[in-house]
Amino acid sequence: MENEEMKPSYWPSVIQAAIIVAVVTTVVGLGLVYYVAGSEPSMGVMMISGLTIPITCLIGLIGGILATRSYAKAFDITFPIGTGAQIGLFTGIIAALVGGINGQIWNLVDPTLMERFADTMIGAFEMNDQIPESQKDEIITSMEEGFEDQSSMGGILKGIAINAGVLGFVNLLSGMVGAKIFASEEE
């Protein structure tokens, strides 16, 4: 312990990267949701909506790399990949929280967006001829209940928690990669 030098705080880098990730994923996610909500119901629209989560997740995983790069370059320091993992984890969790807040703010700006999105998705599913009507009715009821649950306080908190877990994990990994690339310890 006595040989360890005091390292500067990584929190400014974590917060900066988390805000960047949250804003970019919010904008991309909103763009895709607006596209679907403004489209005619079709299977193509359902496929596009299915890409929303993977695309925003791929964008979201850069947070750990951004934060570790920022921290390493700002202070011209090296640190182990464990510290990179920690930086990435915190970046992902904070990005999820900020993204959740962004989403709720946007619900105040356009309160009917998610309703229009749900209507388009359900309409697209209703057009599917390959599913028997009895199964289709059950699935549509389940979709409607899912959309209602997502707009409740419990659903919102559950969504933020899931997002924090996913973004925390992928950024833990990308933080390790960032530490290896930008802050490899001297040997």
Whereabouts are the PLM-identified features?
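Short, charged juxtamembrane terminal tails flanking transmembrane helices
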Residues: 1-7, 180-187
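Transmembrane alpha-helical insertion/packing segments
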Residues: 1-73
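Alpha-helical transmembrane segments of multipass membrane proteins
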Residues: 21-32, 59-63, 95-103, 166, ...
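Membrane-water interface at transmembrane helix exits
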Residues: 28-37, 68-72, 99-107, 174-183
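Selective recognition of hydrophobic, aromatic-rich stretches within alpha-helical transmembrane segments
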Residues: 44-71, 108-111, 152-176
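Alpha-helical transmembrane segments with an aromatic anchor "belt"
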Residues: 70-93
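Functional transmembrane-helix hotspots
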Residues: 98-133
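Short membrane-interface loop/juxtamembrane segments of multi-pass integral membrane proteins
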Residues: 125-151
